[in-house]
C-alpha cells in the first residue's frame, strides 16, 4: 500500500470471505437439520460464525476508512454505486411480493369466493395501528434527514440527538408491528391473503430491524468521532437505506392495508 501510485484501495488478503462462506454453509445445513431432526446445534454455530464474521469484517472496513485513509474519493464513488445497486436489487425483491399480491387480488379465483379479501378473512383496520406505523416511519424519515443536515453543518450534538430519535422510532415501529401480528385475526396459513400479507410485511419488518442496526452502528461511530462533514458515507448509506424502507412501507400501506382491505 505504501508504494502505490493510484487512489484505489487494493484490499489485503482477508479471512472473512472464507469464514462468511463457511457460516452460510453451516446456517443452511443447520436449518435443514432443525427442520428434519429438531437439532439447532449446527444452526446456532452457523449464526454465531456469521455474527462474528460480520462484526470483524465491518470492523476492518471501519479501520481502513477512518484510521488508514483508504477510502479515497474514487473508492467512495465505487461504494456509492454499490449501495445504489444493492437498493435497486431490493426494489425488485419487493416488486415480486407486490406482484404476488396484485396477481391474487385483482382477479380473485372462485376458490377465494370471487372477491377480495377472500371469504372468511377479516382484514386489519388501516386507520388503527397501520396508520400509526405510517406516521412513525414518516417521522423517522424527517429525523434522519435532520441528522444528515446536522452532520453536514458540523452540529455534532443535534446529529446525535436526531439519530437517537430515528433509532427509537424504528424500535417503536418494530414493537407495534409485532403487537399487530400477535393480535391479527388471520395467520400466514390462511390462504393467499395470509401468505402475501405476512411475507411482504414480515420482510419489510426484517429490513426495519436491519436498518435500525445499521443506524445504531452509525450512532456508536458518531459518539467515537468517526464522521466528519466531508467524510461520512457509512451514515449516508444508512440514511439511503432508511428512506428506502420508508417508501416501501408507504406502498405496503396503500396496497395491502388500505386498498386490499
UniProtKB/Swiss-Prot annotation:
Membrane topology: Multi-pass membrane protein
Example of a GO biological process term: respiratory chain complex IV assembly
Keywords from the UniProt entry: Disease variant, Leber hereditary optic neuropathy, Membrane, Mitochondrion, Mitochondrion inner membrane, Primary mitochondrial disease, Translocase, Transmembrane, Transmembrane helix
Pfam families: COX3
CDD domains on file: Cyt_c_Oxidase_III
Top-rank taxon: Eukaryota
One Gene Ontology MF term: cytochrome-c oxidase activity
Cell location: Mitochondrion inner membrane
Reaction catalysis annotation: 4 Fe(II)-[cytochrome c] + O2 + 8 H(+)(in) = 4 Fe(III)-[cytochrome c] + 2 H2O + 4 H(+)(out)
Mitochondrial matrix side: 1-15, 67-72, 153-155, 224-232
Protein EC: 7.1.1.9
Mitochondrial intermembrane side: 35-40, 106-128, 184-190, 257-261
Transmembrane segments: 16-34, 41-66, 73-105, 129-152, 156-183, 191-223, 233-256
InterPro entries per the UniProt record, alphabetical: Cyt_c/ubiquinol_Oxase_su3 (IPR024791), Cyt_c_oxase_su3_dom (IPR033945), Cyt_c_oxidase-like_su3 (IPR000298), Cyt_c_oxidase_su3-like_sf (IPR035973), Cyt_c_oxidase_su3_a-hlx (IPR013833)
Main location as per UniProt: mitochondrion
GO CC aspect terms: mitochondrial inner membrane; mitochondrial membrane; mitochondrion; respiratory chain complex IV
Entry annotated with the keyword Transmembrane helix: yes
Pathology linked to this chain's protein: Leber hereditary optic neuropathy: A maternally inherited form of Leber hereditary optic neuropathy, a mitochondrial disease resulting in bilateral painless loss of central vision due to selective degeneration of the retinal ganglion cells and their axons. The disorder shows incomplete penetrance and male predominance. Cardiac conduction defects and neurological defects have also been described in some LHON patients. LHON results from primary mitochondrial DNA mutations affecting the respiratory chain complexes. Mitochondrial complex IV deficiency: A disorder of the mitochondrial respiratory chain with heterogeneous clinical manifestations, ranging from isolated myopathy to severe multisystem disease affecting several tissues and organs. Features include hypertrophic cardiomyopathy, hepatomegaly and liver dysfunction, hypotonia, muscle weakness, exercise intolerance, developmental delay, delayed motor development and intellectual disability. Some affected individuals manifest a fatal hypertrophic cardiomyopathy resulting in neonatal death. A subset of patients manifest Leigh syndrome.
Quaternary data: Component of the cytochrome c oxidase (complex IV, CIV), a multisubunit enzyme composed of 14 subunits. The complex is composed of a catalytic core of 3 subunits MT-CO1, MT-CO2 and MT-CO3, encoded in the mitochondrial DNA, and 11 supernumerary subunits COX4I1 (or COX4I2), COX5A, COX5B, COX6A1 (or COX6A2), COX6B1 (or COX6B2), COX6C, COX7A2 (or COX7A1), COX7B, COX7C, COX8A and NDUFA4, which are encoded in the nuclear genome.
Role, per record: Component of the cytochrome c oxidase, the last enzyme in the mitochondrial electron transport chain which drives oxidative phosphorylation. The respiratory chain contains 3 multisubunit complexes succinate dehydrogenase (complex II, CII), ubiquinol-cytochrome c oxidoreductase (cytochrome b-c1 complex, complex III, CIII) and cytochrome c oxidase (complex IV, CIV), that cooperate to transfer electrons derived from NADH and succinate to molecular oxygen, creating an electrochemical gradient over the inner membrane that drives transmembrane transport and the ATP synthase.
Similarity comment text for this entry: Belongs to the cytochrome c oxidase subunit 3 family.
Protein name: Cytochrome c oxidase subunit 3
Amino acid at each position: 500500500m505504501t508504494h502505490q501510485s493510484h487512489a484505489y484501495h487494493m484490499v489485503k488478503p482477508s479471512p472473512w470471505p472464507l469464514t462468511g462462506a463457511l457460516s452460510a454453509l453451516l446456517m443452511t445445513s443447520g436449518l435443514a437439520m432443525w427442520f428434519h431432526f429438531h437439532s439447532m446445534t449446527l444452526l446456532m454455530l452457523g449464526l454465531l460464525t456469521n455474527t462474528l464474521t460480520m462484526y470483524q469484517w465491518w470492523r476492518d472496513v471501519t479501520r481502513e476508512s477512518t484510521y488508514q485513509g483508504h477510502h479515497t474519493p474514487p473508492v467512495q464513488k465505487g461504494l456509492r454505486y454499490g449501495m445504489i445497486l444493492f437498493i435497486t436489487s431490493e426494489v425488485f425483491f419487493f416488486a415480486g411480493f407486490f406482484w404476488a399480491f396484485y396477481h391474487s387480488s385483482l382477479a380473485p379465483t372462485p376458490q377465494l369466493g370471487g372477491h377480495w379479501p377472500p371469504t372468511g378473512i377479516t382484514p386489519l383496520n388501516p386507520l388503527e395501528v397501520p396508520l400509526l406505523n405510517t406516521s412513525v416511519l414518516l417521522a423517522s424519515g424527517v429525523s434522519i434527514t435532520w441528522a444528515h443536515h446536522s452532520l453536514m453543518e458540523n452540529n455534532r450534538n443535534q446529529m446525535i440527538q436526531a439519530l437517537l430519535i430515528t433509532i427509537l422510532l424504528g424500535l417503536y415501529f418494530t414493537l407495534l408491528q409485532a403487537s399487530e401480528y400477535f393480535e391479527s385475526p388471520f395467520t400466514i396459513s390462511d390462504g393467499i391473503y395470509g401468505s402475501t400479507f405476512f411475507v411482504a410485511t414480515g420482510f419489510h419488518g426484517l429490513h426495519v430491524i436491519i436498518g435500525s442496526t445499521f443506524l445504531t452502528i452509525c450512532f456508536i461511530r458518531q459518539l467515537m468521532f468517526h464522521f466528519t462533514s466531508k467524510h461520512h458515507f457509512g451514515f449516508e448509506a444508512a440514511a439511503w437505506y432508511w428512506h428506502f424502507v420508508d417508501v416501501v412501507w408507504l406502498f405496503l400501506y396503500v396496497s395491502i392495508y388500505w386498498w386490499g382491505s
